[in-house]
Amino acid sequence: MLREAGTPCVFWGDLFGTPETSDLPAVTELPLLMTMRRALAHGPQHDALDDPDVVGFAREGDEAHPGSGLAVVLSDRRAATKRLHVGARHAGEQWICVLGGHEPVTIGDDGNVELPVSDGGLSVYAPEAARPILDSAEQHLLRQR
């Protein structure tokens, strides 16, 4: 959904659930991730695939989309941190874990940051400055419920 390559396909059942045909609920975070794709997933991508159990990638953002940029860390086993390059343009910024569960982090002067992820978890980070965009997506989600 948030990577540079490809075009994501969102299925009706993922967005709204399919109670008539299965017990699969809607993916509640999907509207937020869709908003992040549109507003924040821009610019060069940097992959961190040096550990088979903890991977990540970051999008630097670009000048055409003020406040853009994001980072994603996934773990299939243990809690960990992943060092990612989000771009020197973000030096000194506070980034937040939009899915919750982790404290804000500060981007280093070189554009690098250590991002935590929980056991078997997914962490998605965005600039604190993007909070109005993210809050708007959350409000839309609450109205849909």
Regions found by a protein language model. Name each.
Residues G87-H102:
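Solvent-exposed beta-hairpin/edge-strand motifs
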